[in-house]
Amino acid sequence: MGKVIAVCISEKKGTQKKNVGSARFVEDWGIQGDAHAGKWHRQVSLLSHEKVEAFRARGAVVDDGAFGENLVVEGYDFKTLPIGTKFRCGDVELELTQVGKECHSHCEIYKVMGDCIMPREGVFTRVLHGGTISARSWDNQVEFQVTLPKAGREGDFHG
């Protein structure tokens, strides 16, 4: 079982997200109040707490949300999961739609550290069923679909 460490949003695109502790997830939209919400395949982004901690151990001073992630979750290496994996936290159900992303311009973290983990460690989901998620109260079970996708290379979208 995983545990949500942080729930983060930003009201404007291009700004770091801030940990708000709890947020409302809206079906086929994303997180209420988050600038990246919308009818597309990258409604909610997830990043492994362990990957963030490993990056901090290299000397990075980063707050939760600094990489643009909505959920920081302990207990999973998200990039190893196949497209279509489903996550449940209370009433909220998310479906994995993309692993990794292309970084078009280097963020402030990259400029300071020479690296950013979000493009290779972050994953994106869409909201299948809405509700509220609060930090440190994750009771999800990862459900793998019976039929795995034919493709699933990093960055591919299957929706």
Features from the language model and the residues they span:
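Metal-cofactor-dependent catalytic cores
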Residues: 1-159
